[in-house]
Structures are given as C-alpha cells and as structure tokens.
C-alpha cells in the first residue's frame, strides 16, 4: 500500500513547493521593480525567507499535520468586490485552508487591494502560475456549513462572496493580526482622532459611524425589497450611545456624505463628518472607523468589518428587507452580525407603499 502512494504524493509535494517558491520570487521581483529597495523589516511577511529555507509557515504546519512531508493541495479564492468583500474572501480562505489542512494562496489582485492597508501574510499566486493549475471551482454560501470542513480536491478555487464570522471567528486573534493596519495608516487616523474636541474638551469615547449609500440606495428597494438606513435609525443609534457613555464623539464616514450632513443632527457639537467617501481609496475612512472604540453601522461588508476590527459595542440596522426578499436566500443576518451586537429594526414602511 505504501509504495502505491509514492508516485502521487511526492510529485504533488514537489509541485506545491515549486508553486510557492515561484510565486514568492515573482512577487519579490515585481516589488523590487515598482519600489525602492526595502529592508527586510519592511518586506511583507510572505516574502521574508532565509536563503536556506524555502518553506512557508503554512507549509511547515501542513507537513506537521499530515506527516511524512505530504502536502495535500492548495486553496485560493476569487478576488471580487470592494474592500469589505475582499476582506471577507481573504479571511474565509485563511480559515478554510487551516480547517482542511491546505496551503492558501491569494490572487495578485487581492494582494493589491489589501496589502497597502493591512499586514496580511498569505502568499500571492500570480496569474501566470495560476493558469497552469487544474482548478476545481467550489462555490461558498455566505455562512459556514459542516461540509466545508471536508472539502475534496487538491486544487480548489472558492467562488462566491463569503463574509461571515461563522467561517473565521474561532480564529479571531489571527484574523485581527492579518488585518493589522500599517503603522502610517493607523497613525494618521489616530492623529485625526486626537485632534477632535467636543464642546472644547477632548473626548475619551469615539464612536465610528458608517453610512452606506451609493448604489445601495437604488439596489435595495428595486432588487432586494429592502431599505437603507434613514434619519430615524441614525438618531436612535446616536442617542443610545449618548445615554450609555459620557460625551462621546461620533466620527461619520460614508459614500454619501452630503446626505449625512443633511440628515444627521450635528447641533450638539458631538458629530464630526470626517470621511472622504472615496470608494476607490477606502483606507482613510476604514482606518478611522477601526480606531474608534465603538461602531454604528448600517448595511454592507465595509461596516461589518470596521465593527469587527474596532471591537467594543456595535449597533446595526436589522430586518431591513421584507420577509419575501430574495436577499434572504444569499444572506443570513445571524451569520453576518455577531450575537452581542445590537440591532435596531429598519422602517420598512416606504416599501409597503408601493
């Protein structure tokens, strides 16, 4: 029996090591061309390897788990959507690869979206290498299922838009480490917050407020039989924090800042419209939210991830679709929002008028 397995496992192991080394070297070469030479300290964690050891931590862990140096295959994932989607895809890949004893590689496009903001560690699988691999596509729902613990196949590429704590919350410390902000991103956000004043005093409690507008204003009612957050929801959420904490300051970010200025009452002097709302450059807004103590979110993965990284108390918009919404076929609220978060039901009356 043992001799029959050798032709299969050894070429696979060699191929996986080749893929890892090739991807890492290619990635390093691209960085050297684009950037000034960096010290070892500044290099991404995935490219810091000694000349005598080409094994990644993931490779060593996989070998230890399965014995005899046998590598069982590799996982990757589609890179689609904006920042919140990309973070959900990354975290899901990270968790499922660990769960199934596989190596995890991310597409270059995902690295380009996340690496400028976070200290991510998964190695990059460049397109030239990916084209040579016989991938098996594997669709993921937006919540964890038991079958995902035993995913068949050696070369699996996940599809879908997974962004649920049910995939990765058991690895929360590691996920938080993966999404640690680069120093300059964090320091810029903290400097802004340190400069804020509420009625002349420096606040001790910061509440990040993310208001998703943009395409959702039309997509939610016209496609998903749902609503976005209205003025009433935001007033209730702000008042809940005012009642709970002494003199909090609300740091508002949105891709609809004009609407926010018209609909969020700032007359008390405790609301700051801080975000730039530039969807193509989300780092500033996201960093501000994560450096706050608590979160008010509306809908969308951007707000979910900001709340997840910030910790503290979170208030979210709940029940924002009709019961027969097709959205509920692809989205489970209980898998999106942590149990300890507090939901305020949305006002669905605008939908009932039509």
Swiss-Prot record:
CDD domains: Fut1_Fut2_like (cd11301)
Enzyme class: transferase
Organism listed in the record: Rattus norvegicus
UniProt-annotated glycosylation sites, renumbered to this chain: 199
Residues passing through the membrane, by range: 6-26
Biased composition (Basic and acidic residues): 57-68
Region (Disordered): 43-68
Residue intervals on the Lumenal side: 27-354
A molecular function GO annotation: fucosyltransferase activity
InterPro entries registered for this protein in UniProt: Glyco_trans_11 (IPR002516)
Note: In rat, there are three genes (Fut1/Fta, Fut2/Ftb and Ftc) which encode galactoside 2-L-fucosyltransferase. They are expressed in a tissue-specific manner and Ftc may have no enzymatic activity.
Expression sites by tissue: Specifically expressed in gut.
Enzyme Commission no: 2.4.1.69, 2.4.1.344
Pathway: Protein modification; protein glycosylation
Family named by the database record: Belongs to the glycosyltransferase 11 family.
GO cellular component terms, A-Z: Golgi cisterna membrane
Biased composition (Polar residues): 45-56
Name of this chain's protein: Galactoside alpha-(1,2)-fucosyltransferase 2
Membrane topology according to the record: Single-pass type II membrane protein
GO BP: any one term: fucosylation
Chemical reaction(s) catalysed: a beta-D-galactosyl-(1->3)-N-acetyl-beta-D-glucosaminyl derivative + GDP-beta-L-fucose = an alpha-L-Fuc-(1->2)-beta-D-Gal-(1->3)-beta-D-GlcNAc derivative + GDP + H(+); a beta-D-galactosyl-(1->4)-N-acetyl-beta-D-glucosaminyl derivative + GDP-beta-L-fucose = an alpha-L-Fuc-(1->2)-beta-D-Gal-(1->4)-beta-D-GlcNAc derivative + GDP + H(+); a ganglioside GM1 (d18:1(4E)) + GDP-beta-L-fucose = a ganglioside Fuc-GM1 (d18:1(4E)) + GDP + H(+); a globoside GalGb4Cer (d18:1(4E)) + GDP-beta-L-fucose = a globoside Globo-H (d18:1(4E)) + GDP + H(+)
Annotated function: Catalyzes the transfer of L-fucose, from a guanosine diphosphate-beta-L-fucose, to the terminal galactose on both O- and N-linked glycans chains of cell surface glycoproteins and glycolipids and the resulting epitope regulates several processes such as cell-cell interaction including host-microbe interaction, cell surface expression and cell proliferation. Preferentially fucosylates gangliosides GA1 and GM1 in the antrum, cecum and colon and in the female reproductive organs.
């Amino acid at each position: 029996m043992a001799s029959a397995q050798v032709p299969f496992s050894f070429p696979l192991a060699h191929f996986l090591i080749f893929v890892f080394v090739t991807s890492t070297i290619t990635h390093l070469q691209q960085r050297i061309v684009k950037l000034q030479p960096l010290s070892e300290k500044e290099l991404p964690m995935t490219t810091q390897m000694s000349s005598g050891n080409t094994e990644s931590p993931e490779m060593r862990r996989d070998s230890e788990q399965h014995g005899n140096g046998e590598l069982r295959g590799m996982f990757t994932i589609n890179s689609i959507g904006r920042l919140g989607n990309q973070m959900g895809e990354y975290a899901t890949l990270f968790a499922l690869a660990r769960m199934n004893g596989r190596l995890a590689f991310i597409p270059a496009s995902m690295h380009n979206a996340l690496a400028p903001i976070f200290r991510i560690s998964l190695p990059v699988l460049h397109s030239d290498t990916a084209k040579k691999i016989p991938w098996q596509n594997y669709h993921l729902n937006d919540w964890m299922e038991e079958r995902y613990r035993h995913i068949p196949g050696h070369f699996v590429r996940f599809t879908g838009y997974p962004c649920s704590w049910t995939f990765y919350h058991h690895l929360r410390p590691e996920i938080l480490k993966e999404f640690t902000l680069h120093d300059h991103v964090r320091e810029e956000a903290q400097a802004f917050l340190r400069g804020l004043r509420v009625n002349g005093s420096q606040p001790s409690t910061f509440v990040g407020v993310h208001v998703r507008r943009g395409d959702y204003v039309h997509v939610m009612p016209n496609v998903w039989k749902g609503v976005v957050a209205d003025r009433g929801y935001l007033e209730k959420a702000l008042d809940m924090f005012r009642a709970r904490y002494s003199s909090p300051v609300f740091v508002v970010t949105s891709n609809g800042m004009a609407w926010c200025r018209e609909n969020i009452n700032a007359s008390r002097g405790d609301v700051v419209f801080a975000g730039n709302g530039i969807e193509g450059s989300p780092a500033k807004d996201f960093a501000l939210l994560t450096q706050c103590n608590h979160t008010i979110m509306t809908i969308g993965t951007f707000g979910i991830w900001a709340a997840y990284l910030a910790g503290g108390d979170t208030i979210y918009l709940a029940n924002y679709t009709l019961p027969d919404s097709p959205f509920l076929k692809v989205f489970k609220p209980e898998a999106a929002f942590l149990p300890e978060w507090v939901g305020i039901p949305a006002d669905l009356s605008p939908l009932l008028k039509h």
